[in-house]
Amino acid sequence: MSSSSPPGPLTGARLAIGTIAVSLAMFMNVLDSSIANVAIPTISGDLGVSVDEGTWVITIFAAANAVSIPLTGWLTQRFGQVRLFVTSILLFVFASWLCGIAPNLPTLLAARILQGAVAGPLAPLSQALLLGAWPRQKSATALALWSMTALVGPIAGPSLGGWITYDYNWSWIFYINIPVGFFAAAVTWIVFRDRESATRRLPIDTVGLLLLVLWVASLQIMLDKGKDLDWFNSPVIVALGIVALVGFAFFLVWELTEANPIVDLRLFTQRNFAGGTIAISVAYGMFFGTLVLLPQWMQGYLGYRAIDSGLATAPLGIFAILLTPVMGRILPRTDPRYLATLAFVGFAVVFMMRTTFYSDVSHWDLVLPTLLQGIPMAMFFVPLTAIILSGLPPEKIPAAAGLSNFGRTFCGAVGTSLISNAWNDRTILHHVRLTEQASPGNPIFAQQLDSARSLLHLSPDSALAFFNTSVDS
């Protein structure tokens, strides 16, 4: 066991360089949660699978990432913050290389599971390292910088992924992590190695970890495969649902009675932590789910190229980047609950604007809600992160950061699956309702079909095919 008093804050160039290195590692992690969004149709086509199956590349990464995050506390106490952070970066680089060379979907999914698992400690440890490196009176600034990287990654991912997929090859959306990761690992080690945290040997909560993996994996597979297997008409889906429910119940009981739990659920007795974690998790699930769906809709129904759909989502970052540093300055003088409430109102307005989208939507009408969404994004992460960590003793911050990041990441995976399934279900419903009108006895349909045949010089079969394509859109 090693012990030492907490080191003082960094200053000058070491603080600046260390902040950049830690932020780059965090950026690399969150970037990979969204960079594949616009590449899913291309990846699916190259690997010979459906777009729905291709979406597993995103959800399986998030699920593996969520499961590994709670291990951060135990691993940190066993090996130390700096060693664990640098090792996670290097393993993330290796997993990224495996993703890039994957010849088929099962291999890619296995590499993404590894990538998500080793990325688990990056978010909570980057937060802890930044808070320890900055003076306590400037902790709001440190949180703002951390939140900015957490924001910019998902925002930059679609545009960067679209450009790489269109001009190069989808493999490079993973290869770009290699130089960034090596740089971040080297600089972090140089700057922070003499600030290693105390280590001690603790028993690992093996039962809690296995229960966590069991219910999370069962729930995620159920959500991803439900549509293909006709949901609860399938005994497989029923079994997965029962396993997820029972596993979750046993997980709760075990973690609340275990002396060294893998997830410290007692943190939820802190009102600020509980409310902030629930709010940030639910909101991130909605945000990330739409971030995954929009590029696929633009490519599948509007005819956008990968690079075009990426650029259409890029304006999300304009206000988010500009306003996040401002949030860090005004947060100490403002009640963060008011800012978070305004952010939720802003999200509601943006989602209402998107309900007016149709197949002939103009580019400006498509981009405007995305541009405006950057405002509530900036007012969302920083205040809620401050609420989550407020009032906690320093020794509880790593566990609290890990648990809140678990909730956020897990809800991102679940939100993606739920929104994708809802989209597919509504598409089928509206297709059925529209095709119900496609009968020779319907004079309006017959007239419109004749008009299409005359205008486009189509045969009867081609006119019906044209109608079916229009309905699908």
Residue ranges and their predicted role:
Residues 2-3, 8, 183, 407-473:
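Hydrophobic transmembrane architecture of multi-pass small-molecule transporters
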Residues 13-73, 77, 96, 106-108, ...:
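Transmembrane core module of solute transporters
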Residues 27, 59-63, 90, 144-148, ...:
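Transmembrane alpha-helical cores of Major Facilitator Superfamily
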Residues 38, 70-71, 125, 155, ...:
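Residue-level hotspots within transmembrane alpha-helices of multi-pass secondary transporters
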Residues 69-208, 235:
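Helix-loop-helix hairpins in multi-pass membrane proteins, especially solute transporters
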Residues 97-101, 185-190, 249-253, 352-355, ...:
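Membrane-embedded alpha-helical segments of multi-pass transporters/permeases
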Residues 145-147, 153-158, 162, 290, ...:
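Small-residue-rich alpha-helical segments with characteristic i,i+4
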Residues 186-206, 253-262, 359, 425, ...:
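Helix-loop junctions on the cytosolic side of multi-pass membrane transporters
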